[in-house]
Amino acid sequence: MQGPPSNLTKSPYGNKEVRAIANIKEEKDAKGKTKIYINWMDSIRTKQAIALKNTEMDLKKYGEDRLEIVNGFGTVVEDGYLTLRYSTAMRDLKAKRDINLIVQHSEKEPYKLVLAYNAHGDNKGRFASGFIAFRLSEIDKIAQKNGKKDVTLHLHWKSYQGDKHTFFKYHVRNDSK
């Protein structure tokens, strides 16, 4: 497929770099070229990963509530972002929640990430899921300083079954966006 979608002439987000999820279909233009048609599109909450100086002390202030990372559609690392599909228990869908990705850089583990979640007391009830994306510019800086183009990210989080972790292969983004 080449070029912009057939039903969109400019980004609905302006020049802002965002992660989005879309429902699309393929169609042919008048010359027989395959194009896409966007049925719907929604932006994904996007944040910078946070680099902390004193991670042991500071992690608690970012939250230690439990959530699940969905191992499937939506959980991916690409283009300088870690996008996560998550699920957690809640009673009030409109209650404030904070999710942050902490870069816990050390000599031993230069690419360790900790997902910190603060449910602000609303951590029981029905499960609901969502998406969040984190820009990995701190990881990019560390990897480039170490002369790496590809690294293995080590993500840790608190799950309902206890502490969990997983690994992601990541191709370092080589710009400073």
Cite the ranges covered by each PLM segment.
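Start-of-domain marker
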Residues: 1-39
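Short, surface-exposed linear segments at secondary-structure transitions and domain or protein termini
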Residues: 8-16, 107-112, 174-177
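Short, solvent-exposed, Trp/other aromatic-anchored flexible loops in extracytoplasmic proteins
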Residues: 13-18, 25, 119-160
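Ordered hydrophobic segments in well-structured contexts
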Residues: 17-23, 35, 81-87, 112-114, ...
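Surface-exposed beta-loop interaction hotspot
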Residues: 30-87
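A structural detector for beta-sheet-dominated domains
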Residues: 70, 102-104, 116-118, 137, ...
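Short helix-loop boundary/capping segments
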Residues: 70-125
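Short beta-strand elements
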Residues: 161-177
